[in-house]
UniProtKB/Swiss-Prot annotation:
Subunit structure as annotated in this protein's UniProt entry: Dimer of alpha and beta chains. A typical microtubule is a hollow water-filled tube with an outer diameter of 25 nm and an inner diameter of 15 nM. Alpha-beta heterodimers associate head-to-tail to form protofilaments running lengthwise along the microtubule wall with the beta-tubulin subunit facing the microtubule plus end conferring a structural polarity. Microtubules usually have 13 protofilaments but different protofilament numbers can be found in some organisms and specialized cells.
Residue positions binding Mg(2+): E69
Lineage of producing organism: Eukaryota, Viridiplantae, Streptophyta, Embryophyta, Tracheophyta
Cited PANTHER family: TUBULIN
Identification of the protein by name: Tubulin beta-3 chain
Underlying gene: TUBB3
């Protein structure tokens, strides 16, 4: 079976990851001891994508949990599903990374990385046909960003032909955790551009807005935010875990979404999102889901798709519905909003349908879009980065761990190049493209 190996790193990654496993266990009928207590054969049909079957009918998550301090892991272990993970798969240090990317990537993290890789290898050897890795981490701190990207590049070396999917929480514009977030995030993006295949971009502020405006929660907690993320993660992978009429896997997803290798940062959305009180006043229909899914307010990162154009997009529907209706609705969106899609990639929206809806809903949909407007986010981080870097503020924390200023300059220009690439394709039209080709041919001839 096509297994996926899940890795979570740092405080944020471990908290998102824990929530993800709660959702997945619930969907597959696995209780908190790892025993199956479900009611449908479909739950077990492809359970080995995410679980290993151990002796005595226990299902153990294919998960590796890492952190540079023990705190988050201890609370995870004592949480509702803490006993389900393999104890050897918890890998942690004692020192912490102190929100310093260099500590995570070069010093503290580098000391721990080999023991993490040993666990990853052990888990990979347990798979029949490993499809790829999914990594949960944040880019603002030290461990998830520094050590997370270190692990991603090491895995890249060892498993070059496997897919690498990340769920990356970007620093948000207004809600800041640490003052050095722009440094950590820029250094991480520099790595993710080169070493990851697909990045699902999340950000706390957008998630706060969804909780506040749409779900009408007065004081959203990180638990609420993580619940939104886990719903999306479950939606992205449901085609791999349940039978469906139009299935996709990590590689199909990449082939359909990534027109140029560096542009692999996606916006994600989820529908239906309604406040608890107004749930019963809305019908769940394919048109409803489609409309809400494409809504800018539903995007889980602080970039507005209306400020750019979609290169590609993919929609995953769950529940009993007609594929014909799904196709009609998706076509409808494209026809009505054709100016928001680049015209030089025809049929750039793909949909897939999985028969099993999430717990408590009759149908749902998950949206993944490759939009040029995501450059707004990189631009924002880059401006904050430049403001501090120009004055060399806080730099001694990084150079003290052996980093070179040159590395900062490279990361900065790589991020700016990425923004420029998005802008270039946002402005490109079908006619221009043909001219480019002629020029290139002439050069070759010359």
């Amino acid at each position: 079976m096509r297994e996926i190996l899940h890795i979570q790193g740092g405080q944020c990654g471990n908290q998102i990851g824990a929530k993800f496993w709660e959702v997945i266990c619930d969907e597959h009928g696995i209780d908190h001891t790892g025993k199956y207590a479900g009611d449908s054969d479909l739950q077990l049909e492809r359970i080995n994508v995410y679980y290993n079957e151990a002796g005595g009918g226990r299902f153990v998550p294919r998960a590796v949990l890492m952190d540079l301090e023990p705190g988050t892991m201890d609370s995870l272990r004592s949480g509702p599903y803490g006993q389900i993970f393999r104890p050897d798969n918890f890998v942690f240090g004692q020192s912490g990374a102190g929100n310093n990317w260099a500590k995570g990537h070069y010093t503290e993290g580098a000391e721990l990385i080999d023991s993490v890789l040993d666990v990853v290898r052990k888990e990979a050897e347990n798979c029949d046909c490993l499809q790829g890795f999914q990594v949960c981490h944040s880019l603002g701190g030290g461990t998830g960003s520094g050590m997370g990207t270190l692990l991603i590049s090491k895995i890249r070396e060892e498993y070059p032909d496997r897919m690498m999917l990340t769920f990356s929480v970007f620093p948000s514009p207004k809600v800041s955790d640490t003052v050095v977030e722009p440094y950590n995030a820029t250094l991480s993006v520099h790595q993710l551009v080169e070493n990851a295949d697909e990045c699902m971009v999340l950000d706390n502020e957008a998630l706060y807005d969804i909780c506040f405006r749409t779900l009408k929660l007065a004081t959203p907690t990180f638990g609420d935010l993580n619940h939104l993320i886990s719903a999306t993660m479950s939606g992205v992978t449901c085609c791999l875990r349940f039978p469906g009429q139009l299935n996709s896997d990590l590689r199909k997803l990449a082939v359909n979404l990534i027109p140029f290798p560096r542009l692999h940062f996606f916006m994600v959305g989820f529908a239906p999102l309604t406040s608890r009180g107004s749930q019963q006043y809305r019908s769940l229909t394919v048109p409803e889901l489609t409309q809400q899914m494409w809504d800018a307010k539903n995007m889980m990162c602080a970039a507005d798709p209306r400020h750019g154009r979609y290169l590609t997009a993919s929609a995953m529907f769950r529940g009993k519905m007609s594929t014909k209706e799904v196709d009609e609705q998706m076509l409808n969106v494209q026809n009505k909003n054709s100016s928001y899609f680049v015209e030089w990639i025809p049929n750039n929206v793909k949909s897939s349908v999985c028969d099993i809806p999430p717990r408590g809903l009759t149908m749902s949909s998950t949206f993944i879009g490759n939009s040029t407007s995501i450059q707004e986010m990189f631009r924002r981080v880059s401006e904050q980065f430049t403001a501090m870097f120009r004055r060399k503020a806080f730099l001694h924390w990084y150079t003290g761990e052996g980093m070179d200023e040159m590395e900062f300059t490279e990361a900065e220009s790589n991020m700016n190049d990425l923004v420029a690439e998005y802008q270039q394709y946002q402005d490109a039209t079908a006619e221009e493209e043909e001219e480019y080709d002629d020029d290139e041919e002439e050069e070759v001839a010359a």
